[in-house]
Amino acid sequence: MGGREVGGLANMLASHREIVNPIHRLEMEEFWGGSIISDKIGLTATEMFKGLEEGKLKAIWIVCTNPMVSLPDARMAELAMKNAKFVVVQEVSNRADTIKFADVVLPAATWAEKEGTMTNAERRITHLSKVIDAPAQALPDAEIICRFAAKMGWGNKFEYNNFGEIYKEYTETTRGTNIDVTGVSYQLLKERSIQWPAPAALPAPDGGAKNSFSDSDNFTFDEIEKAPPSGAGRGWT
């Protein structure tokens, strides 16, 4: 869930905005104050690895996943990484299948070694507390990305003193959207979990909206014709 809210899909921007929607792109361009956002949808995970296999994509940075396990075709993933010109693996374990293909390994902290938030399938946002320190040079994924951005000359866009500031920026991107959580502070999440939406105009003393889209008016699908699956009547039950 949480990855979709922050725009972690190839066709999305923050807070359920769509890359192909010019209004959505303009909103994020103005919010970030940076360059023009391309209207081209990015590659999905399977498309990226297919691109590596075919030589259309040269490099890949793998974060928070093991494609040898998560992708449907593990053999294709292996061939793709063998064919890649440059592979960066950001991992919590030195035993991951992807390590042997890496040109650069970035040691990442595990869930118990970092803090942040997660969103589950009922739209419930929960604060995750750090339990122990990460070993050696391992860092939280967000900190690795911020440090990389600074090396690339974008440090002024990634100047966060703590993870609460990152969360605060995210909440501002949700303002006025169907997942508005401007009424949910980082401190509040440390006290209890909250279900979105929970906008600042409608504080969530009892934990946010239990039922989303309950007005039966907004964000609903149009009625569609019901039809049997292809092949019905030939062995379908």
Outline where the language-model segments fall.
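Non-catalytic alpha/beta scaffold blocks inside enzyme catalytic domains
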Residues: M1-D180
